Amino acid sequence: MTQKSFPITPEFLAAANVTAEQYVEQYQQSIASPEATDAFWAKQAELIDWIKKPTKISDVSYDLEDFRIKWFEDGELNISVNCLDRHVKNNPYKPAIIWEGDHPSLHKIISFKELHEAVCRLGNAMRKLGVKKGDRVTLYMPMIPEAVVAMLACTRIGAVHSVVFGGFSTQSLGNRIIDSQSKLVITADEGIRGNKRTPLKANVDRALDMDGTDSVSNVIVVHRTGNSVPMSGRRDIWYHSLVDGESQYCEPEVMNAEDPLFLLYTSGSTGKPKGVLHTTGGYITYALSTFRDVFDVKDDDVYWCTADVGWVTGHTYATYAPLANGTTTVMFEGVPEYPTWARIGHIIDKHQITVLYTAPTAIRAMMKEGDTFVRESDRSSLRLLGTVGEPINPEAWDWYYHIVGGGKCPVVDTWWQTETGGIMLAPIPGTVAMKPGAVMNPLYGIIPEVIDTDGVALEGAAEGNLVINGSWPGQMRTIYKDHARFLETYFTEYPGYYFTGDGVQRDEDGHYWITGRVDDVLNVSGHRLGTAEIESAIVAHPATAEAAVVGMPHDIRGIGICAFVILKSSETATESLKAELNRHVRTEIGPIANLDAIYMVNVLPKTRSGKIMRRILRSLAAGQYVGLGDLSTLADSSVINELVEVVKTERAK
């Protein structure tokens, strides 16, 4: 765990929204008592335009016999009004969305007024198709403006959207439609990313051939590429012909704060999909307040969260929070490497982006290609960088800070989950010097605890399981149609707490470091080692670009350490390099971190959101090459054969 820290530049501090002293004072006030926490969230709720202001702030019990999570329960509002109408009144022609297409020649700027009209037209059309408050609508779309229009149109009329990432398979899509019993599907003819097409409409057709999808009465299809797709006469409707004749105003549905807002399915490693349910008032309050705090938001910011709308980050921090705040949000259809790795920098310059929020996977991928592509752009418009999705190793953090940000932009390393609705731990910029790889501090109203396996809360510098003491407005309310699974997963192991499933270290300064999933903590000879810590040590070696570490059976140590390593393109895999890597890790962490197996590979098995599927690597490390479980969420299933060959060859030596 590095203790190197980087102070915030004086220029940034001078303009920061919050000082270190203010953070400490406000944080302590926000957690002083349950009444103080309610008072804090009542104040944050004033950022929202309510139809009926809430008088009851929270009603929460983690007692399994009397369980409830309710926030602002007597309040009424409509989220689309908060994202659109109030800005149309004050600043109608401000860009709401800057859309950058897959090809660099394509871009579109959509004002709040134009977005409002598009949302109202689709909302009216959906009502005419019989979609009512509480009905589920599945979106299976590329990163085009109509995806955001569809999300907001659902909120306009009180429908519950379930966005399925456009890269998911027919089977995954079908399972989510069946579980949600959606009435309507909105899709496009095809998606296009990196000049490669995805047959979205054809996938929808195949998904709707599955048993249990009879709930779907219509499919709305956006014309994106223009390639011919089969259209079923009664069921399928072209988006543009549907909305063209509709009114530019749609009466917003009055929603109770605890009415469902959206479902978002997380892929468990096995079993049926897990539908995370978020509700209306608490979610938007938490999204907006954390957005303003973590990103030090200014009125003239051009903000780019690179997440696809199919993921929770794309919901909260690419769509709802920026639009609710009246901030211009950038939406990118393509991939960082098309047409070259310089694309991200060129987009930053083209649209004068001020805040960039992206994932360590993308940062490491760019870093692997070297600095030249990044230096093709100026990037002087940037003032703040963010990272999300997984722990960032200090080397990638360092490269992001110095090369992408030029050493002048604070990096906010954020920890949160689909389940939490918004960011929970992050260094609010201007309040604390940054430590590469640390998520640093809790946000207001959030009380993290470090708990050992016996359920004892640890004080001071400690390592253990991360739990949250108490509730917060953005918290998920249930797993759709499976409340028992919700209680069992998050509230049973450590009674009275929300169990995150993540491991954490708290250092001597009281700052937090996420060590990876609890099942990614290795117990080696009775010593606990976080895989993130070992991976960081490996990637600190100049020859390596990326690494994934898993446990493997070991005759002596019980659990051994197995590393899958991607080298930089200029390096060659040799036995001497393996030995050097092992020496390096032992030096960085200690002899206990001896690497028992090192596999030099070209690729790692990743989901479409960029997360490494470690259970596959665990099976391979144990010599199991078949029966690897559900591979439907893999971005590229062909990598499995390649990995199997590498492991077999090495184990045969």
From Swiss-Prot:
Q: Where are the transmembrane segments?
A: none
Name a GO molecular-function annotation: metal ion binding
Which keywords does this Swiss-Prot/TrEMBL entry list?
Acetylation, ATP-binding, Ligase, Magnesium, Metal-binding, Nucleotide-binding
- Gene3D superfamilies for the chain: 3.30.300.30, N-terminal domain of ligase-like
Q: What is its EC number?
A: 6.2.1.1
Which residues does the record give as CoA binding sites?
R193, G194, N195, K196, T313, S525, R586
Q: Which cofactor does it need?
A: Mg(2+)
Q: Which GO terms describe its biological process?
A: acetyl-CoA biosynthetic process from acetate
Q: Which residues bind ATP?
A: G389, E390, P391, D413, T414, W415, W416, Q417, T418, D502, R517, R528
User: Which reactions are catalysed by this chain?
Assistant: acetate + ATP + CoA = acetyl-CoA + AMP + diphosphate
HAMAP family per record:
Ac_CoA_synth (MF_01123)
Tell me, in a sentence or two, what this protein's role is. Catalyzes the conversion of acetate into acetyl-CoA (AcCoA), an essential intermediate at the junction of anabolic and catabolic pathways. AcsA undergoes a two-step reaction. In the first half reaction, AcsA combines acetate with ATP to form acetyl-adenylate (AcAMP) intermediate. In the second half reaction, it can then transfer the acetyl group from AcAMP to the sulfhydryl group of CoA, forming the product AcCoA.
In Swiss-Prot or TrEMBL terms, this protein is called Acetyl-coenzyme A synthetase
To which species is this protein native?
Answer: Psychrobacter arcticus (strain DSM 17307 / VKM B-2377 / 273-4)
